[in-house]
């Protein structure tokens, strides 16, 4: 079995709450240079819920461009809005993300059928 190792990436913010891309790049380099096969950007550990839609697009686009095939990029594309989730997922794949990961609906009671349909 050929296992792959992925690291969920924390999102680094500047004092003004913008994304600190210099820190992000340093973190990408660190994990990829130390045996990790790929990253998960914009997931739960990356505070996806704190990013507006444009910030999420920029975070994904920057990660794909910066990593430039040195590792696998999985983009967290879950949003509270179904259409935003679909659009962000399509955006990530078109930008070159290797895969997307989508969190199911949260903070609301959903049946298994509701989650499946989502």
What annotation goes with each model-predicted range?
Residues 1-7, 11-118:
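Active-site beta->alpha loop and helix N-cap motifs at the rims of alpha/beta catalytic domains
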């Amino acid at each position: 079995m050929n296992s792959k190792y992925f690291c969920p990436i924390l999102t680094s913010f500047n004092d003004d709450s913008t994304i600190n891309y210099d820190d992000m790049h340093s973190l990408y380099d660190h994990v990829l240079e130390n045996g990790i096969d790929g990253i998960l950007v914009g997931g739960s550990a990356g505070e996806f819920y704190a990013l507006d839609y444009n910030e999420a697009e920029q975070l994904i686009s920057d990660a794909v461009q910066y990593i430039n095939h040195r590792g696998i990029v999985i983009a967290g594309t879950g949003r509270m809005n179904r259409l935003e989730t679909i659009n962000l997922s399509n955006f990530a794949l078109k930008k070159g993300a290797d895969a997307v990961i989508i969190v199911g609906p949260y903070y609301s009671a959903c049946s298994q059928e509701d989650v499946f349909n989502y």
